[in-house]
Amino acid sequence: MFSYYVHLAIRSLRRNPVLTTLMVLSIAIGIGATMTTLTVFHILSGDPLPGRSRQIFIPQLDPRPDNQPGQHPFDKLDYTTAMDLRRARRADRQAVVVDSQVKLRAPETGRPALMLQMLSTDADFFPMFQVPLAYGSAWSARDDEDRARVAVISADLNDTLFGGSDSVGRSLLVRGSAVRIVGVLGRWRPSPQFYTLAGGGFAHGDTAEFYARPQDVFMPLSTSLEVNGDHFQPWTCFAKPSMPLNLPSAPCVWLQLWVQLETPAKVAGYRRFLADYAAQQKASGRIGRSDTAVLLSLPQWLDHNRVVPGDVRLQSWLALAFLGLCLFNTVGLLLAKFLRRGGEIGVRRALGASRRAIVAQCLTEAGLIGLVGGTLGWLLTLLGLWALRQQPVAYADLAHLDVWTFAGTFLMALACSVAAGLFPAFRASRIAPAMQLKTL
C-alpha cells in the first residue's frame, strides 16, 4: 500500500511543478540554515575529553587577604597556591599550566625566528589529557625536577620547520637557549581549548578565542621559568606588585592546576584536602576567607566559562525561528494544494477510501517533499559550512559535517515536512464526498 501512496504522491507533485518547487525550496532553505548553525553549536558545545571529562578537575582558591563575602575566586591561581597544591600530590595525575608567547627558531633549517604560543606545564599533562604523539614521547617527571631543556612541538610547527618528518632529537633555540625536541604531537584539536580557559564568565559571549588551536611548543614549567620567565604575563593582580615584576612572588594570579581523580572517593578526599589547606592558609593570614576553595569538574568549568560564543547561540535561535517561518509557509502551500484536490479526494472517499487512508496519502506526499528538500538542504548545509571555514574566526576549521549532522539533516527534514503536512492532511480528510460529487 505504501508503494501505491508513493506513486500517487509522485504523480501529484509532477502535476504542479511550481508549487512543488516552492515547497521543496522552503524546506531546503530552512533546513540548510538551521543545520549549519546547529552543526556549529553541536561542535562548540561538545565534550573536549569524551569518556574522561568527569575525572578531570580544577581547584580554585581566592588568595586575596581582604576578600569580602560574595566575591568569587579568580579563574587562576597565584604561584604559592599552585605550587603548594602541586607538591602535595593528592591526585592521580596533576599538571600546572600557563601559556605565553615565545620567540624561537630552528638553527639547522636557516629559517628566521618565529613568535609562537608556548604552554608551560608538567609531564602529567600528556597522559592526563590523552594527548597523542606522532613521534617520540613526552618528557618525564624527572625532567620536571631537573629543569631539563626539552620540548614537545605541535604537528603544525613540525610541518613548518621540518616538513613533517621525525624531528625528535633536533634542537630549537628558545629565547637563545638550546632546547632538544623529545616529541611531536599527533593531530590534536580539543574543542574548546579547555586547559587554558579563564574569564568566560565576564566575556559577554565573546569566547571565540577559546577554540584556538593548541600551542606550538610545550615545555616543562620549571624550564620555562628559566628560559622564558620574563615573558610570562599576570592574568590579574589583587595588589600592586613591585617592579620589576617577579611573578612567583607577586600578588597576582596567572597559573591553573588541573588534577585527575579517578573515583568519587578520591574526589571527596581532594575536596577535604583543599578545604583543610584553605583553612590553614587563612589561619596563617595569607588569605582572607577559606570558603572560596572549590573543586570544579571539567563540565562544570565549561559551564562556568560559558564557552559557546554568544553570536553562535543567537544564530541558532534565529535559524530555528527562520525554520519555523519556512514550515508555516509550507503548511499554507500544502493546505492550498490538498484543498484544490477536493474533487479527487471526494471521489476516493465515495469509492470507499477511509479518512485514515486520505491522511496517509497526504502525509506520504509531504514526506516525499521533505526527502527532496532534505537532500537539497544537506547540500546547502555543506555550502554553509564551507562559507564558515572561510571566516577569520578561531573555530572556522572545526566546521565540518559529521555523521550526526548528516543523519540529523534528513531526519529533521522528514519530521518538519510531516509535521507541516498534519493539519492540511487532516483538513483534506474532512472533505465531504457528497459536496464534491455535486460539483463534478
Q: Which residue ranges define each predicted feature?
A:
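Generic structural signal for small/hydrophobic residues in well-ordered secondary structure
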Residues: 13-16, 35, 44, 58-59, ...
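Structured, solvent-exposed hinge/loop segments at the ends of secondary-structure elements
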Residues: 38-161, 165, 174-179, 190-193, ...
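Transmembrane alpha-helical interface segments in multi-pass membrane proteins
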Residues: 21, 328, 344-389, 408, ...
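C-terminal membrane-exit region of the final transmembrane helix in multipass inner-membrane proteins
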Residues: 408-440
